[in-house]
C-alpha cells in the first residue's frame, strides 16, 4: 500500500496497480518525519546504553557479592513483575510533574530504565551465575579487582545476554506509544509513534498510504537488528533463564 498511487489502502484488482515512491518523498519533505525519526533514535539509543550499564552492574552485584537482604531484594524484584505497568501510570505522571520532568527526555528515560530494571536484572544475574567463579578467583590471584574482573572477564563471556538486553532496551522506546504520550508535550520532541498518530489524526482519513509508508520505515531498523542478532538473542534468553 505504501508504494501504491492514491490514498486508498486496498485495490479491487492486482492488475494495473502503479507503484510510486511519492509517499516516501512526501514524508521527508512535507512532514516532520525525519525529526521524529531522529528523536526516537536518540531516545532509544540512550535508553539502550544506560540500561546496559545499570542492569549489568546491578546484576553483577547480586551475582558475585554477598550482603544482608540479598535474597529478599531478589524476591521483591520478582514480585514487581506481577503487576501491570498501567497500574503505575498515574503515579508516574505525578512524580514526573513534581520533579518538573514532564516534556523532557530525562523523565521518559527514567521511566524506561527503571521499568525494565527488575526483569533485566533477574535475567542477567541468571546468566552471570552460570559463569564459573573460578575465573574470578584466578583473576584475583593475578591481582585483578572487581572492576577489572567485571570488564575483562564477565562482560566478554556475557555477550549473548548483553545483546538481548540491548536490543530489548532499544526496541522499547522505538515502538512505545503510551509513555511518550503521557510525558511529552512539545511537537519538536515527538517520537515516531505519537508523531505519526497525531499527523494522521489531524488529516482525517486522507493519507492511509502515507501512514503505511511511515509505518514501514519504522519497522526497518528493528527488522535489521533482529536479523543480525537473532543468534545472540536466543542464546542469551535461554541461558539467562536457566539456573544451574
Write out the residue ranges for each language-model feature:
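A structural signal for multi-pass alpha-helical bundles of membrane permease subunits
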Residues: 1-244
